[in-house]
Amino acid sequence: LLNIKGKRSVDSIHKELGHIMWEHVGMGRTAEGLREGLEKMKALRKEFDTNLFVPGTAEGLNVELDKAIHLRDFILMGELVANDALSRNESCGGHFREEYQTEEGEAKRDDEHFFYVGCWEYQGNDDTAPVLLKENLEYEAIKVQTRNYKN
């Protein structure tokens, strides 16, 4: 990271990532917005890899280097969150896809296809798509039902 010698500060890239996440992967999500966000994050990752400037050295404490290391992880995590949201063709909990809502604007779940815990496995290469691992949910003590906020 210290050898890139670009022109962008860690903070400027971090701020841009936050804007992308807010605009495209925030509370109200759409497939189109998620795809656009993923493209922007991919471009931002390339910008990070080629145009980052981290002042200082690797000797001793270097706060900017520490922030850069974490920011690289944040970019990858943002991509994983967006990929997960794009793969879930439903609205459930904190995940609200605008395409999947009732006429009243309530979340529209699809338990038939998305009743599982998902974990995305990084493949060790940023250009290789992560693999979704699934573990089906099995409830014995409670009955699964749709939340109703009207009553």
State each model region's role.
Residues 1-151:
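Glycine- and aromatic-enriched mobile tails/lids
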